[in-house]
């Protein structure tokens, strides 16, 4: 396996990684249409076909008793760590809460903006090659902080029952109901509603390509957070960085799935060589070795560039989900970062700290979309409404201007709405 690449070789890998087969979208459209028209009947058939679900509609929803049982199966260490993570995520997202505001003009007009939470939020939690309690936390906690009263979680059941760690995380994070269903059919159920699963106002959370395309297609029927793709990290490092750290950080992303990306960019050829050696060494120790190998082959590597400016330019071009600056005085480079979902500064801020415990959200824009998308936040679960109050004095001061503008646009009923109020005063 070739690990040390030039810039062109890496960009070629990235371009091939972004290619999406058109027939997948057609399959997803069919699933969405059938769930929209047939509801639970189509949903349960797809759950059996794609999720391996063996039950019926009566046990599609996870019971409180099953969650109680899950608590007895998880260890105290996990529960303590989970609660610490939830508190840190809660504290961070609470700082994001915007305030409604009003301003009063001299003539008595009152203008303002108010924020209200959506009524029902749907969160998608993957259940593929691994279980992700952390994804539950990162999706549910911002919704709870925003004030959402009903948080509906969907996640495919693998095996005879739901993962107990995921169930415990859901209750601890404030999820109000859980359904054992995944894939595009779960997104369809959340978007259109069925007799069993309620229609939601917003859908958040990452998934596979089918989930991502489904979210793209239902956008407009409901709101979504973003179109999340495979996980990725780019690490910029100089000779002060430890090869052990760089190799481990590459591998931590590559183990997600075969399309995940772990990239190191450096202008130190010797550091690149030593990092490649450490990657080979660590690979022998990891249980998800085959997944990692495919990921590195598909979209990973160590790129040697001329200098730090070229490294930053390449990183901004890639616009990664996670960017690590493993450099002396990393804060000095922060202003040069234009595109990244999250930025990790220094030797002791590896990406997994953000995945689990730091506090900022780990649901981040991928596949170059950090050029225009932002991390999941309380904003995804809030709506803004403008508030307008005119006093009589304020109305009369502005009325003739409104009439002129409305008539210029040919909207004479708009002008009439103002004129009748003038004539009655």
Swiss-Prot record:
One of its GO terms (cellular component) is cytosol. Its cofactor is Zn(2+). It catalyses: L-histidinol + 2 NAD(+) + H2O = L-histidine + 2 NADH + 3 H(+). The keyword NAD applies. Its EC number is 1.1.1.23. It is an enzyme of class 1 (oxidoreductase). Zn(2+) binds at residues 253, 256, 355, 414. The active site is at 321 (proton acceptor), 322 (proton acceptor). InterPro entries: Ald_DH/histidinol_DH, Histidinol_DH_CS, Histidinol_DH_monofunct, Hstdl_DH. Substrate binds at residues 231, 253, 256, 322, 355, 409, 414. PANTHER family: HISTIDINE BIOSYNTHESIS TRIFUNCTIONAL PROTEIN, HISTIDINOL DEHYDROGENASE HDH. HAMAP family: HisD (MF_01024). Catalyzes the sequential NAD-dependent oxidations of L-histidinol to L-histidinaldehyde and then to L-histidine. This is Histidinol dehydrogenase. The lineage of its organism: Bacteria, Bacillati, Bacillota, Clostridia, Thermoanaerobacterales. The gene is hisD.
């Amino acid at each position: 396996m070739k690990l040390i690449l030039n810039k062109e070789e890496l960009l070629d890998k990235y371009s091939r990684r972004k290619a999406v087969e058109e027939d997948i979208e057609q399959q997803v459209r069919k699933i969405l249409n059938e769930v929209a028209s047939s509801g639970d009947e189509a949903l349960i058939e797809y759950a059996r076909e794609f999720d391996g679900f063996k039950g019926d509609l009566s046990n599609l929803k996870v019971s409180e008793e099953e969650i109680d049982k899950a608590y007895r199966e998880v260890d105290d260490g996990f529960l303590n760590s989970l609660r610490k993570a939830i508190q840190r995520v809660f504290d961070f997202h609470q700082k994001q809460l915007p305030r409604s505001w009003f301003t009063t003009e001299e003539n008595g007009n009152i203008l303002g903006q108010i924020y209200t939470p959506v009524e029902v939020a749907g969160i998608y939690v993957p259940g593929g090659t691994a279980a992700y309690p952390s994804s539950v936390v990162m999706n549910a906690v911002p919704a709870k902080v925003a004030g959402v009263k009903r948080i509906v979680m969907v996640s495919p059941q693998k095996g005879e029952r739901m993962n107990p760690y995921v169930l415990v995380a859901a209750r601890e994070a404030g999820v109000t109901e859980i359904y054992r269903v995944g894939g595009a059919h779960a997104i369809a159920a959340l978007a259109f509603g069925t007799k069993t699963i309620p229609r939601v106002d917003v859908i958040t959370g990452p998934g596979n390509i089918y989930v991502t395309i489904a979210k793209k297609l239902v956008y407009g029927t409901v709101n979504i957070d973003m179109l999340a793709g495979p996980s990725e990290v780019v690490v910029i490092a100089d000779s002060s960085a430890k090869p052990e750290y760089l190799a481990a950080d590459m591998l931590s992303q590559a183990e997600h799935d075969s399309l995940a990306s772990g990239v190191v960019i450096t202008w130190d050829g010797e550091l690149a060589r030593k990092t490649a050696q450490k990657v080979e060494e660590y690979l022998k120790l990891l249980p998800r070795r085959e997944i990692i190998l495919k990921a590195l082959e598909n979209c990973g590597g160590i790129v040697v560039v001329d200098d730090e400016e070229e490294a930053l330019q390449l990183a901004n071009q890639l616009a990664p989900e996670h960017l690590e600056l493993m450099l002396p005085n990393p804060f000095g480079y922060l202003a040069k970062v234009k595109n990244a979902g999250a930025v990790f500064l220094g030797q002791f801020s590896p990406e997994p700290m953000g995945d689990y415990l730091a506090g900022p959200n780990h649901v981040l824009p991928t596949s170059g979309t950090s050029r225009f998308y932002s991390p999941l936040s309380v904003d995804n679960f809030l709506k803004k409404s403008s508030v307008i109050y005119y006093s009589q004095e304020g109305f009369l001061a502005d009325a003739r201007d409104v009439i002129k503008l409305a008539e210029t646009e040919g909207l004479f009923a708009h002008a009439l709405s103002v004129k009748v109020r003038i004539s009655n005063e």
